[in-house]
A protein has these predicted regions:
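Generic recognition of cysteine residues
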Residues: 3-5, 59, 119
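Selected N-terminal structured segments and early membrane-anchoring regions
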Residues: 45-52, 76-89
């Protein structure tokens, strides 16, 4: 992210050229699900993660928030491509600026197409509030508050009906 001012947002709103505008809306994916086998195939060691297509790397990358910041997890691209192929909204994510944000701490799990800066906001929350080996009560409360806010602000994408 180079700038977040309204002027740059207007200038780069069409996504042409080198810079892209980060969208403001998050979308709750009511019909998206990952079963345990799919999640395990992605090799994410915790139950929070975000996935986005990086134009610099020319592939989808996976990160999870940690006490040390955003931590990259080596992603099995075949597993990811199989998941993405079944979900049109995931295929439509804008490179570099939108991510699939997964919250498997919630019951049931929650899935959002989120502006990338919200993913890094969550990472900052984890980094700021983490204490000790297991994180401490403050971090889990802050994570829950983050997702409550995101859930309330997100546009709900209704399930597809055949």
């Amino acid at each position: 992210m180079l700038c977040s001012c309204d002027g740059c947002a207007l200038l780069f709103q069409d996504g042409y050229g080198r810079y892209r505008r980060i969208p403001r809306d998050a979308y709750y994916l009511a019909d998206f699900r990952l079963d345990e086998l799919q999640w395990e195939a992605l090799s994410i060691p915790i139950n929070l993660a975000f996935f986005f297509f990086s134009t610099a790397a020319n592939c989808t990358l996976a990160f999870y928030p940690s006490a040390g910041g955003a931590t990259e997890s080596l992603l099995d691209l075949a597993a990811w491509n199989g998941i993405a192929a079944a979900h049109p909204r995931i295929q439509q994510m804008r490179p570099d600026v939108e991510a699939l944000l997964v919250n498997r701490l919630a019951n049931p799990s929650e899935y959002y197409v989120s502006p990338i800066d919200r993913c890094y906001e969550l990472t900052g929350i984890v980094r700021k509030h983490w204490s000790g080996f297991t994180g401490g009560d403050a971090v889990w409360k802050a994570i829950a508050e983050f997702f409550t806010t995101l859930r309330n602000e997100a546009v709900k994408v209704e399930p597809r009906h055949a």
